[in-house]
A protein has these predicted regions:
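Hydrophobic alpha-helical segments at protein termini of multi-pass membrane proteins
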Residues: 1-183
């Protein structure tokens, strides 16, 4: 789990770093960091949330229409149909709110991480921000991995942790943006 969280941090933050050193090297204004963070977080939110929501919507429409053949074709097996149906049955307003909290937290984190990595890419003296971003990313991802593997049973503490991490990252990134990042 630690390996997975750390790997995600390394690949995403080093990817950001390479992006700032190559594709965005001409964008020297610090606002580029915020823009890149919004783009990264926004695309992730769309791919993670929209893809699963679209699947649930198609599944629910087939279920309500009584089209079991389409469900089996979509799911591949009767067991998968039962699993998705049980999952849809647990989909409450509270779950939707937690999903929104997670996406907002992830957006704030991606904006913050982009600011740190931008500072690291623009100044050798600030390369420590890259390691900080990798570590913060891993810390952010760890509770979700613990939940997925069953070590944490409740979703609310995980989402609360993500929100706290995102707010800490945002506060730290604001300081970096205002005081330490090149204008």
């Amino acid at each position: 789990m630690l390996y997975g969280a750390l790997t995600a941090g390394i690949f995403e933050e080093c990817g950001r770093f390479c992006m700032y050193k190559t594709v965005m090297r001409r964008y020297d204004g610090r606002a580029a960091a915020v823009t890149a963070g919004i783009g990264h977080g926004g695309i992730e939110a769309m791919t993670v949330s929209a893809a699963s929501m679209a699947l649930y919507l198609v599944f629910a429409l087939c279920w309500n229409a009584g089209d079991t053949d389409a469900l089996l074709k979509l799911a591949g097996s009767a067991e998968t149909v039962q699993t998705v149906a049980a999952s849809l049955g647990k989909y409450t307003v509270g779950y939707c709110l937690l999903a929104c909290l997670e996406r907002v937290s992830a957006m704030l984190l991606h904006i913050s991480l982009s600011v740190f990595v931008f500072a690291a890419a623009r100044s050798r003296a600030k390369r420590g921000y890259l390691a900080f971003a990798i570590g913060l990313h891993a810390i952010f991802d760890m509770p979700a991995a613990l939940y997925q593997f069953g070590y944490v049973k409740q979703l609310f503490p995980v989402e609360l942790w993500l929100a706290v991490c995102a707010l800490y990252a945002l506060r730290s990134a604001r300081k970096c943006y205002l005081e330490e990042c090149d204008a």
